Amino acid sequence: MLETNIREQIISLIHHQVVPAVGCTEPMAVALCVARAAELLGSKPEKVRVLLSANILKNAMGVGIPGTGMIGLPIAIALGALIGKSEYQLEVIKELTPKGLEEGKKFIGENRIDIKLKEGITEKLYIEAICEAEEHQSVAIISCSHTNFVYESVDGKVCMDKRGPSGSVAACKGVDLNLQTVWEFATTTPVEEIEFILEAKRYNIRAAAEALKGNYGHCLGKIMDRPLSRGIFGNSIYSHIISKTASACDARMGGALIPVMSNSGSGNQGICATNPVAVFAKENENTREELIRALTLSHLTAIYIKQSLGALSALCGCVVASIGSSCGITYLMGGDYVNVCHAVKNMIANLTGMICDGAKPSCSLKISSGVSTAILSATLSMEGKHVTAAEGIIDDDVDKSILNLTSIGKEAMCNTDDMVLNIMTHKCD
């Protein structure tokens, strides 16, 4: 068992990274930043200017905003300015009413919002909100993670500044992890210390159930429950996992006002790290303790990988979260640490390179690809099969294999990221 102080640090890390969110986290982070700037201003903004990193812009362009029936940043910004409460963090607009929505639409119609790309920054996650009213101006900046405020000012007077030299933001700090530590924590920590992770199951399975009541996104989750799909995939654990995972994503990307438990700033990653594990545990008749440990393993694996990948990248986050769920499912199958390492290598060999082209309804398709690969990788590992160091980017050392994955996503795919954003922003030219 890990030492008490190490366990406490990891538990704190999980609490920080696994949090509730309503709607896609990128537009909600923008709404949060605007809400804080409006609070600093102390009155209703007459004008809102927002400067964003390319990755934030990419992830917020085509996704539904909860409770509005609208997509994109303008309505998120308007609602953040008018009804948002920063104390709610990524649930910033959870008190939205029909009246508030109409006011938001009016705010947009009056051309009070200006959205631009922030130039000269290296941060993948950067949001700067500037609110103006009469002769007053307030500024709030979020960087590094979705709720991490690093700068606040009112009328030029700095209230808070946690930025590094030359306006850069100091690197996000966290607990240094490796897969062995993740495994040891998840499998040996007293269960009462980690049972809080069941909240992720409660949130995300409920989101899946609510999603099946409506018609959100591409309805992938619902379609998996229909006769045609059942005839192809059967009434199996596999089909149930895909349905329960994709449906929660359908709802979230479709703008349903349904909270989910996120992971590392992403609701889809939270869904992907939770629902496959929870569904498998139920159908496999695993114990409550086994479920708790599997969910912890899944979420902490995703957090570990995101530490080197970064909050936002050119690599689809569902790849990362699916690696976590594959580890959790492998554990529920009775696998040991070696089996989990093999499952991770199988995942990296299969899914590395899947691009992120923004948050949108079709994310449910990518989630389904990730989750189906997670099940396949876990099954292969339990049969003693895994991709070896003689093949491609896989290394004998599982942590080096993970670093190979994240290096490709963070460094090698930078030009890919630029091209994706260029395509997305010029489709109507």
Residue ranges and their predicted role:
Residues 1-11, 43-56, 236-255, 288-305, ...:
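Acidic-glycine-rich active-site phosphate/pyrophosphate-binding loop
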Residues 2, 21-25, 55-56, 147, ...:
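A structural signal for small-residue-enriched, beta-sheet-centric alpha/beta enzyme cores
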Residues 2, 6-40, 45:
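N-terminal signal-anchor module of multipass membrane proteins
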Residues 20-36, 258-275, 316-320:
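Conserved phosphate/anionic-ligand binding catalytic regions in large, soluble enzymes, centered on
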Residues 31-121, 126-128:
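Early transmembrane hairpin of solute transport permeases
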Residues 37-38, 280-293, 303-369, 382-392:
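Hydrophobic alpha-helical bundle architecture
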Residues 44-48, 88-93, 114-116, 193-197, ...:
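Flexible, glycine/charged-enriched surface loops at secondary-structure junctions
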Residues 109-255, 420-429:
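Signature of multi-pass transmembrane helix bundles
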